[in-house]
Every structure is written in structure tokens, then in C-alpha cells.
Design a protein with these regions (language model features):
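Active-site cofactor/substrate anionic-group-binding motifs, chiefly glycine-
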Residues: 48-102
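Catalytic-core signal marking the mid-to-C-terminal active-site face
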Residues: 2-7, 12, 250, 255-360
Length: 360
């Protein structure tokens, strides 16, 4: 088991700001990237948090990540937008794309927004939360252009990415339902976290480089590579293909069909559907029935091993409250990878440690 540092949230922001400035990013970009990544840690999704910065660093040094660029409009057809992320930080171009889509959906009642060529968009739930905060329903289909890490159902090697699907449903007077999941049985970043902590993953999550079942996360992290399995067997596989065709081929004009493992960049395509419920529904009936259903479902008596029935998005909010008060846990291996990334960017690792309050 790896040693874990527990870092105060404000201190973590200061430390990560120092690192991200090493990309040559503007102050606004530094804030956007750090806020998004640390928010992922706060919600309990360390797989999409600051542990991604070493990968971003390698991508940047290879020329695959372009700091200080903004989303470009390729097509504006009223309720349909096609946007190019220009390989910029997903935390920046993703927010800009969502702002354009939200504005158009408010104006017209709906918007189909296609974003391509964005560097890693981070936790897709963050973009769904932006839609819900604007009172909109949203659906997000995302593909991944990088080293394949997930095997098709019945296949023995990796052919595509974790291809997340996300949805947001605003609920009157309550926090929204945010459904956000990888179509693989486990996110690749979670296998990285497990590997760094010296932990195994549960059974039926991974296969090794020969297609045999394994619980060792190293087969998703270091060569020889194996593959992660899809959730729910053929069902997750079907969802993964759906996300590849919609987020990749349709939205981005770029789908995964290469076995090149040499590049560190991670590009995402995202097809987003935004709907203003006030423009299509009887709002009184919608709000009444939505809350009635949610209350009916969550009132189910919990079975053994559970304290209560939760709605999607609740675990993240609970984690956010806990970690905001208690600090963010970062395993020592991941922290060392972050320090190594800082050094590659010309940032003194000691300054990162000092800002975070971590003893060298």
C-alpha cells in the first residue's frame, strides 16, 4: 500500500497553479484547469483529477496539447453547432463549448452541439452540472482518441477508450440528477490510481495481454497492455460503440481505429444534446412527476450493506463536502509523478511541495 498525503484544498490549488503555469498558460487558463481537476478530486473521482497532469505534461511536450487556444465555431446552423477545440485544454474549450450550447438552447429551446478535437475534457459530469445549473436537460456522448484501453465484448484486446455517457436532469428545489459513467466497467484512471496504491481491482474488470482474466491493474497502465472490460457485458459494449459513433465519427469526425500506443495525447469528441424543459413540457406536471418518482424510488428500504437508496450525483456531493472539510487524499506515487511533471515543465518540485504543505 502506498503512503497517502492529505492536502488542504486551498493549498492544493496554490500548488497546482504553480505547476500549470509551467505550460505557459494564461492566468484564466490556469484557474480553469486547476479548478476542474481539483473538483474531480473533491467529488471522489481521483481518476480525473490532478493525477492527469503528468499525462497532460507528456502530451504538451509532444505537441499534442496546445495551451491558450479557444474553441472555434465551424458550423452555426441555429439549433446545431459544430465546434473545434483545436487541441486546447479540455477544461477551457469544454466550458466555452457548453456556454455556447447553453445560450443557444435557452434561445431556441434545444441545441445539438458537436465538439471535436478537444484535449482531455476531464470529468464529463462537470459539463452536465453546468447544463443543469442553467435549468437544462443534457445528454453527452463522448469518445476518446488515444491508446485503446477497452476490449469489445467477446474480444481479447483493447480497441477503444472508456467512452463516457453523461446526463443531467434538473429537479425543482433540489440538486440535479447527474448520471456520469464510463462505458467500461472501471475508468482507466481508476486502474492507474489502484496501480499507484499497490491495490488490485475487482474480478471481471480486466484481461491481460493474452486475453486472460486478471485483477492486476498494471495491464491497463504499463506494457504489455491488456484491456478493461465493458460494463454489463454486451450492454456496455453497445453504449461504448454508440458513444464512439456519435461523439467520435459524427461530432468530431474522428473515431478510434489505430493501435498506436506511442502518443500521450488524449483527444475527446463530444456530442451534446441540450433541452430546455420549459419549452417542451407542462412544467407543473413535469416537476410534480419527476419529484414523485424520485421520492418513490429513494424511499425503497435499503438492503443489507446499504444505508439508503441514492440518486445519481449524490455520492459526488457527499464526497465534495467531506473532502472540502478534511482535505484531498493523494497517494505518494501519484504525488511523485506530479512532482516529476513539474520538473519537466521547468517548475521547481520543492515549490510544489512547499505550496501543498507536503514534506519532501
Amino acid at each position: 500500500m502506498s503512503l497517502t498525503h492529505t492536502i488542504d484544498v486551498d493549498a492544493l490549488h496554490r500548488a497546482m497553479h504553480l505547476l500549470v503555469r509551467g505550460f505557459g498558460s494564461s492566468d484564466a487558463e490556469v484557474r480553469a484547469v486547476c479548478s476542474n481537476l481539483i473538483e474531480a478530486n473533491l467529488t471522489g473521482h481521483d481518476s480525473h483529477g490532478i493525477g492527469m497532469l503528468p499525462r497532460y505534461t507528456d502530451s504538451y511536450l509532444e505537441g499534442g496539447l496546445k495551451p491558450n487556444v479557444h474553441v472555434r465555431t465551424v458550423l452555426d446552423a441555429g439549433a446545431m453547432l459544430r465546434l473545434d477545440g483545436q487541441a486546447g485544454f479540455g477544461q477551457v474549450v469544454g466550458h466555452e463549448a457548453m456556454a455556447l450550447g447553453v445560450e443557444r438552447a435557452r434561445q431556441l429551446g434545444c441545441c445539438v452541439m458537436a465538439l471535436g478535437n478537444a484535449h482531455h475534457l476531464g470529468r464529463i459530469g462537470a459539463w452536465a452540472e453546468e447544463a443543469a445549473a442553467a435549468g437544462l436537460v443534457s445528454l453527452h456522448f463522448v469518445n476518446v482518441i488515444s491508446r485503446g484501453i477497452v476490449a469489445p465484448h467477446g474480444g481479447s484486446d483493447a480497441r477503444f477508450g472508456t467512452n463516457p455517457f453523461t446526463a443531467a436532469i434538473p429537479l425543482k428545489g433540489r440538486a440535479p440528477m447527474i448520471l456520469d459513467f464510463a462505458t467500461s466497467v472501471i475508468a482507466q484512471g481508476k486502474t492507474r490510481v489502484a496501480h499507484n496504491k499497490g491495490e488490485q481491482v475487482p474480478p471481471d474488470h480486466l484481461i491481460d495481454h493474452e486475453g486472460r482474466p486478471t485483477q492486476d491493474p498494471r495491464y491497463s497502465v504499463i506494457e504489455p497492455f491488456g484491456a478493461i472490460l465493458t460494463f454489463g457485458a454486451h450492454k456496455g459494449y453497445g453504449m461504448a460503440v454508440l458513444c464512439e459513433l456519435l461523439g467520435g465519427a459524427l461530432a468530431a469526425g474522428m473515431a478510434q481505429h489505430s493501435d498506436d500506443t506511442s502518443k500521450k495525447r488524449v483527444l475527446n469528441g463530444m456530442l451534446t444534446v441540450l433541452i430546455d424543459p420549459a419549452k417542451i413540457a407542462d412544467m407543473a406536471a413535469y416537476e410534480r412527476e419527476a419529484l414523485a418518482f424520485v421520492d418513490w424510488v429513494t424511499a425503497s428500504p435499503p438492503r443489507e450493506g446499504f444505508d439508503r437508496v441514492r440518486l445519481a450525483g449524490e455520492p459526488e456531493r457527499e464526497s465534495r463536502a467531506k473532502r472540502t472539510g478534511n482535505g484531498v487524499p493523494v497517494d505518494a506515487t501519484t504525488w511523485q509523478e506530479i512532482l516529476n511533471a513539474a520538473n519537466k515543465l521547468g517548475v521547481d518540485p520543492k515549490k510544489i511541495n512547499d505550496a501543498a504543505g507536503v514534506a519532501a
